[in-house]
């Protein structure tokens, strides 16, 4: 870790997550004696993180500077932007600011974690939270979830504009378009630094409007006039949920919901008025058998093939209430998150094996919620920042986004393709990376947060590849004599019934070692264990 010089007239901008990766979005802005945090997301574990449930950012820098933190400001309610909040609030109870739906979804998460004392604050677009040295403004955005916002941080050095996740959708489902007028006003005042998402920076053109999905769903529902329809999508894609409900209403189908997160989101979004479900249309999952196949639509989690999701359990015949049958139409209305392709493929194959028709990976049933190249260019032209730092994406995405900015005329020395933990110091005249802060992954395994480290992951990997052998032996504490055993328990190593000679040979080796230790009057458990371990290593050689 390089230490950076203390300069209270410089604004420090640091990412604790979201750079060189998908997910775990978290940005820290520090000015004088104040810190604000934008988003606090989680990500999913990769293939090497065996047994890990979720990954959250390392917040040791925030814990060290907790007295400076004025709040966490949420751009929208997706898991990669709010998923780490319960774990953070257990360590630092600081105010949370977000739009109504974002706060509603956060409340559900905090309730699951039994956190009752959170300081939650609902804001509206164009609201400004005034601090001593910064003012934080929420600005209406378009994304795949309602109430998405960008954030403008006003300082006496200039404005820092953080886009959050966005797309430029001129025909959004809820009719709420991006507040381009306010962005232009900020541009006239002068934007010092732009942080813009890079998720689709590799993709040419513009992202299609969410409304185009409606036509694709309409066509599939019409063709499946005699089939039961099951639609899997992201629970938090509320605009998509609304379109599925609208299509179901058009074809006189009832709607049931499966999957814990889907049930929670539908309940919150309906209660807050973001999801419009006609009276008597939503039915209990237990009641779907009371209706003919062509009278019901099931909306479910599992669009990413998550092993414990509702769709995955249906595919493996482990769902308690839904059994896939021949003739079912399964619509997977989502693109795979990088790394999930194998999981999704496994689920799709299982669904086909059960006789279902599966529609997936088609452009007319899913559109992205992230800006492509032409929208990113437009954002740069609207904001006209002095400095630029691409955010939210893997390295190649950040790099391509930086090249787009350079093509638009921004000097290369004003563009910063940073890594997580880099400290960008900036004022009205200059910007420079001056050091780093501690960052990394904190692995959540069940109730344990940060308990799983590299050594534990290494051991889990070895167990998964090589199996396990346990030697059970009872030894007298007084004189070191063997009282019982040795017995050998093996899992994932060899099939014992077909390897009796091998196991008998191993027992004989262990007996010889124990006999030698007994003759030498060795009683210490640690020494005995090492003798057996080194004997095993020697046998391997």
Predicted segments with their positions:
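His/Asp/Glu-rich metal-coordinating catalytic cores
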Residues: 2-73, 78-290, 309-323, 342-346
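Short, intrinsically disordered, charge-balanced linker/junction segments flanking boundaries
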Residues: 6-7, 520-533
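Hard-cation-handling environments
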Residues: 208-332, 337-338, 345-348, 352-359, ...
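Histidine-centered catalytic/metal-coordination loop motif
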Residues: 509
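Conserved small/polar residues in nucleotide/adenosyl-binding loops
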Residues: 534-541
